[in-house]
Amino acid sequence: MKKILYKSFLLSLIAFLNIYAKADIIVSQDGNGNFSTIQDALNSVSVENEEYKIIFIKNGLYKEKLFIEKSNIVLVGENKDSTIIVYAELRKKWREKNPDDYGAGVVNIKNNITDISFISLTIRNNYGSLFGDNDHQFAIRAGEGVTRIIIDDCYIIADGGDTVSLWNTDDGMYYHNNCFFEGYVDYVCPRGYCFIENSRFYGHNLTASIWHDGSLNKNHKFVLSNCYFDGVNGFPLGRFHRDAQFFLINCTFSENMADKRIFFAPSNPPRILQWGEERVYFYNCHREGGDFIWHQNNLELAEGKPNPEQINANWIFNNKWNPTVVLNLIKKEFTKNE
């Protein structure tokens, strides 16, 4: 047993040393890096940067609000349990003195910035636990023109709604893997294309957990594969206010989930959908304690009648982007000389 633990420790150490060696920029609060704050590291990247810049962030509690204003950046934490970015910001409070949402989150991605990756980090907006208000508070916020965003092996948490708000309605493409998401109403709420797999969700509200806006393209979709959903007793799965399309494949729901299908929520003034309310598809999804009829298999009702094996990154993003290939290339840089 001791040999196994020692081998595991050595493998972790080797992986850490390789990431450290391959990083373009190192952030360390103890002064043993290029910068002691993440924002200073981000600011050091050239505006003309066209290749991925790997910023390695050593363990620490980073009480920072981040503004990402350059493309092609990879933020890699030493360990998601101990590399923590935390800041308290309430959206409505921010908007009292600011014209838009840029700056309302912990991580703020400027319009038209592309190709950003977050790996092995905790990102948390803790306004609610500090001040008792669980209204909208972003952990990550992005808007127009922001696309090709990867979140891998991360905890993304907010003490309010809209935890992960990637809102490029035109053609946003987002991929999240092996993550934990937590929040209140609509806490994972992409616009455009989004693919999440091998991840866990925890919701604290009785309104909705996931949300989607696919109103500008009939092919926009929110796909969740091999995910686990949990929350407070009676938590609902999801809703949408505009045209949307959900695919849930091989997902598991805790017994706390309410008997309430993903629903079209009313707006004022009322919205008329272009493609109908029924574009919510399931395959092999089950609830602990017993299934509800509304999440039975119905993939054959989707346009093109896709089979489960067909639902991969290339299919989801229409062959425009394969984030799993990108992620593997990034990780290969960490282990090239292992």
Feature map (PLM): residue ranges:
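Bacterial Sec-dependent N-terminal signal peptides
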Residues: M1-D24
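Sequence-level preference for short, compositionally simple segments enriched
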Residues: D24-N32, S36-E338
